[in-house]
């Protein structure tokens, strides 16, 4: 994606991509990323008091295109189409939905495939970043747009990790949050599976130490294998067995070099990602997920969570293998502003936060009720003092 010479410093037209220049960013680890741009989209009108912004935060391979058809700059349709629009859970007749492409991504924001001032891609020079760094970049982009406080942050998976960092690190900037399919820190299981995905990419000869962007050779095979592995953690075990079992793929015979149906499905998922995503961004963002720990430098997870007054709804999925329900239960128990833990009974696994539209829509509506009940700041537990668990 080409960034225009003059970046947008006002919100773009509805559904269009704008590019906000935030200057240099110093990461949590002390590295400096110069000339940072953040891609932004919005739906709905900003109120005169600028108090109706709902920040929608995407997952690992998502982008700012939350809703709308595929088109120029949008290789795929919106990833949460049913959640944003007139009359939708994020009702754009009332709310202004704003989404960024995350720092380190490859859909308009500065990342490994972006060119530096020397005209060359960042490649291996792009530093490791954290979820916290991503949030700092988002906050800087919104500040450049004249938005210093938001009504709510909502997100699942990596987007949920970003939402958690928002409410813990910047409670005065956000009135409510929705934390979907996420935990307070990365688990050993997550780190193990994600390190294996990174290894698959880096073992591809075309990786070239991360400096492949101008060579005409890209680590597509490694990225596709990483995606296949990841996709297994995104879907539910019962769902996969119900859909595919041990069936062969159409007229192929696995006993004679043919494929299983589930094998073909995973290969297709890998090919789809390679067509739209950069391997360098996949590595950088996965490393950020591995380092996720809301308690780092805050006295540990419990202390960090207990210090956060922001009203929240926490959502989990019964069949989530990547972020199992116990992680959302911990968030609900430790966050004093948690109004409700909503548990979605679904066979779809971690991806339930993307496909269980009715249940997720209800969570968003409840989150925005919390946002609407707050004044200029979180100001205590408020509605969050009434904790409960709802199963859907």
UniProtKB/Swiss-Prot annotation:
NCBIfam families recorded: homoserO_Ac_trn, PRK00175.1
Function: Transfers an acetyl group from acetyl-CoA to L-homoserine, forming acetyl-L-homoserine.
Keywords: Acyltransferase, Amino-acid biosynthesis, Cytoplasm, Methionine biosynthesis, Transferase
EC number: 2.3.1.31
Location, primary (coarse class): cytoplasm
InterPro entries cross-referenced by the UniProt entry: AB_hydrolase_1 (IPR000073), AB_hydrolase_fold (IPR029058), HAT_MetX-like (IPR008220)
GO cellular component terms attached to this protein's record: cytoplasm
Pfam families noted in UniProt: Abhydrolase_1
GO biological process: homoserine metabolic process; methionine biosynthetic process
Pathway of action: Amino-acid biosynthesis; L-methionine biosynthesis via de novo pathway; O-acetyl-L-homoserine from L-homoserine: step 1/1
UniProt-annotated binding residues for substrate: 227, 351
Name recorded for this polypeptide: Homoserine O-acetyltransferase
Catalytic activity: L-homoserine + acetyl-CoA = O-acetyl-L-homoserine + CoA
Subcellular location: Cytoplasm
Active site: 157 (nucleophile), 320, 350
Subunit (UniProt): Homodimer.
Enzyme class, first EC level, given as a word: transferase
Residue span, AB hydrolase-1 domain: 52-356
Superkingdom as given in the UniProt entry: Bacteria
Family named by the database record: Belongs to the AB hydrolase superfamily. MetX family.
Span list, region Disordered: 373-392
GO MF terms, alphabetically ordered: homoserine O-acetyltransferase activity
């Amino acid at each position: 994606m080409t960034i225009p010479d003059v970046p947008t410093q006002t919100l773009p037209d509805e559904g269009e991509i704008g590019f906000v220049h935030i200057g240099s960013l110093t990461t949590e680890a002390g590295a400096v990323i110069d000339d940072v741009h953040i891609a932004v989209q919005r739906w709905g009108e900003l109120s005169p008091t600028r108090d109706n912004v709902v920040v929608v935060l995407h997952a690992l391979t998502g982008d700012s295109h939350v809703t709308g058809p595929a088109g120029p700059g949008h290789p795929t349709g919106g990833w949460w189409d049913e959640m944003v629009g007139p009359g939708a859970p994020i009702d754009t007749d009332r709310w202004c939905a704003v989404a960024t492409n995350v720092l380190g991504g490859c859909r308009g924001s500065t990342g490994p495939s972006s060119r530096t001032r020397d005209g060359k891609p960042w490649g291996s020079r792009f530093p490791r970043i954290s979820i916290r760094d991503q949030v700092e970049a988002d906050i800087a982009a919104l500040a450049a747009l004249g938005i210093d406080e938001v009504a709510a942050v909502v997100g699942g998976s990596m987007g949920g990790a970003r939402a958690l960092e928002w409410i813990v690190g910047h409670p005065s900037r956000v009135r409510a949050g929705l934390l979907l399919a996420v935990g307070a820190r990365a688990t050993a299981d997550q780190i193990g599976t994600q390190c294996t995905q990174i290894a698959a990419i880096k073992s591809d000869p075309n990786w070239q130490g991360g400096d492949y962007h101008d060579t005409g050779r890209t680590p597509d095979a490694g990225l596709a294998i990483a995606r296949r592995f990841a996709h297994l953690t995104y879907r539910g075990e019962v769902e996969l067995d119900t859909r595919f079992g041990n069936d062969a793929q159409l007229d192929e015979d696995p006993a004679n070099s043919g494929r299983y149906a589930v094998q073909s499905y995973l290969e297709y998922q890998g090919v789809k990602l390679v067509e739209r995503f950069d391997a360098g961004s996949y590595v950088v963002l996965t490393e950020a997920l591995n380092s996720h720990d809301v308690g780092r430098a805050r006295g540990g997870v419990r202390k960090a969570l207990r210090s956060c007054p922001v009203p929240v709804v926490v959502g989990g999925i019964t069949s989530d293998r990547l972020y199992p329900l116990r992680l959302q239960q911990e968030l609900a128990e430790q966050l004093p502003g948690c109004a409700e833990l909503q548990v979605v009974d679904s066979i779809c696994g971690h991806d339930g936060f993307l496909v269980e539209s009715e249940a997720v829509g209800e969570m968003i509506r409840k989150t925005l009720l919390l946002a609407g009940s707050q004044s200029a700041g979180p100001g205590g537990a408020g509605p969050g003092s009434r904790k409960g668990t709802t199963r859907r």
